[in-house]
Design a protein with these regions (language model features):
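Membrane-proximal helix-turn-helix segments that form the acceptor-binding/catalytic region
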Residues: 94, 107-125
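Aromatic "clamp/platform" in nucleotide-sugar-dependent glycosyltransferases that forms part
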Residues: 253
Length: 293
């Protein structure tokens, strides 16, 4: 997402990205990337770094790409104190399933402390699908919502060259409870006889404790020969997985878009996903299956 956004916006304007250092940094063309310290409300290092960047960059517009992080809310506050317009893109983080998860212990305190104000004060909210816009309107905090769909650089993605069955199914996304990987494991357990000779590859990074719980679930069901958790994959290895798999499977509870779905289709690999995504066209276009969990 940021690679495509930075590349294209950078052709039209001067683009700066404020972020934290990553173990797997992505090259983004036509923009300047600024790594800042991790937000800490006790010391002022993060605030000072961001303030200095604002003084140097003097932005005309700030585009915030997250929710539920005090650092993002702080950057929005700093921008609006300087009379800089702010666009907030929740990326599905304000979908009902997400808000309900840990509502009393995490979401409600965050809403009261900073997140509700951030949504209300944003000059514009960007939704990436009609379903996301409808849910943002139901939330009732800000009605100035525009739909700007996400996209991928399809021309740079190589189509698979063989449609011969590889007997490989692929999950490639963040390893998080929202993604419904447990349903994939349960389905494999039910269909273990039909899946003899198949591999289900689960690619992605996630919280160590959650990854460990999935591995334990796989062991408890005796599915070690079928399901493999391989960690995060990037670059050529990622595209190789898309191109060599028979299906891409994303059994998610909720997605505002699902970039990996678009990437799989661009690679020529059909997709099985849920009604928690806005990809109902999969059924009508015979490109996969859009199903209830």
């Amino acid at each position: 997402y940021m690679q495509v956004l930075g590349k294209e916006l950078g052709k039209l304007a001067e683009v700066h990205i404020i972020t934290h250092a990553s173990e797997n940094p992505l090259p983004i063309s036509n923009c300047e990337i600024h790594n800042v310290s991790v937000y800490n409300p006790i010391n002022g290092r993060f605030k000072n770094e961001v303030s200095k960047l604002f003084d140097v960059i003097k932005p005309d517009l700030v585009h915030v790409n997250c929710c539920w992080m005090p650092a993002c809310a702080f950057i929005q506050q700093m921008a609006q104190k300087r009379n800089v317009k702010v666009v907030l893109t929740p990326h599905g983080m304000l979908e009902p399933w997400i808000i309900k998860r840990h509502y009393w212990t995490r979401k409600l305190p965050a809403l009261l402390l900073y997140q509700k104000a951030a949504i209300q004060n944003a000059d514009c909210l960007q939704a990436t699908a009609e379903s996301e816009k409808e849910n943002l309107l139901k939330l009732g905090y800000n009605s100035n919502i525009k739909i700007v769909k996400l996209g991928i650089d399809a021309e740079s993605i190589a189509m698979k060259t063989s449609w011969k069955k590889s007997k490989q199914l692929l999950f490639l996304s963040r390893v998080h409870v929202k993604k419904g990987i447990n349903y994939l494991i349960e389905a494999a357990d039910i269909l273990r006889d039909e899946l003899q000779g198949y591999k289900i590859v689960v690619a992605g990074e996630g919280d160590a404790d959650y990854v460990a719980s999935l591995k334990q679930q796989i062991m408890d069901k005796g599915l070690q020969d079928i399901i493999q958790l391989i960690g995060g994959v990037y670059g050529d290895k990622k595209w190789e997985l898309f191109q060599t798999s028979d299906f891409f499977v994303l059994p998610t509870h909720s997605e505002n878009f699902g970039l990996a779905i678009a990437e799989s289709l661009a690679s020529g690999t059909p997709v099985i996903t849920t009604v928690g995504t806005p990809w109902n066209d999969l059924n009508s276009s015979n490109a996969g299956a859009w199903i209830e969990i």
